[in-house]
């Protein structure tokens, strides 16, 4: 096989063909999309396609994220409330420490006590998704200031703040689960979503042994942490 033929099939000599075709032109992008739709692209190829797309759209994604972030900081009721609650505890989250960046791992965002909030601009589906993500990370910031969370060494602390963030941010409300994630249950949907996302987050931490360990830790703190809606009077969304 010639070099050009190998390149057109998204593979190199000695490497398995993933179905991904490198290239930024419109025709190549459409060929990749049709390859995905036809089931001819492997999971590795799909990831290659996503990475190339994210790099190509990085400037536009970050600009859109920053514009929506600034709008939400000014007009979103939940974001403004969380900002005020954090400020009352001596913290300050604003456009200068809520960063929109392209992320290489598949997550929506993150919180670091020393730096602020990271929003993965290439993972944001729309402004509603960004609002949920900002609210989630702001709950972490609030918990860090109010409860002195030990992020590195205490899995129970991590589980508790993940339960609260998923419950209070709005990311587990019924409409979000139904239309975006394909979760069709009507009863106990909110609790199941919160539990599922908390277990996944705890499982990803270095101190967690396996999924059973993550589930055990979440169960140990579930009742008290799920009932704790501070700084809200009740679950807002």
Swiss-Prot record:
Record EC number: 3.4.24.-
Predominant subcellular localization, coarse grouping: mitochondrion
Membrane topology: Peripheral membrane protein
UniProt-annotated binding residues for a divalent metal cation: 136, 140
Localisation: Mitochondrion inner membrane
GO molecular function: metal ion binding; metalloendopeptidase activity
Listed GO biological process terms: mitochondrial protein processing; mitochondrial proton-transporting ATP synthase complex assembly
Pfam families per UniProt: Peptidase_M76
Catalytic residues identified in the record: 137
InterPro entries: Peptidase_M76_ATP23
Parts of the chain that traverse the membrane: none
GO annotations of cellular component type: mitochondrial inner membrane
The entry's keywords: Hydrolase, Membrane, Metal-binding, Metalloprotease, Mitochondrion, Mitochondrion inner membrane, Protease
Lineage top rank: taxon: Eukaryota
Family that this chain belongs to: Belongs to the peptidase M76 family.
Protein name stated in the entry: Mitochondrial inner membrane protease atp23
Organism: Aspergillus niger (strain ATCC MYA-4892 / CBS 513.88 / FGSC A1513)
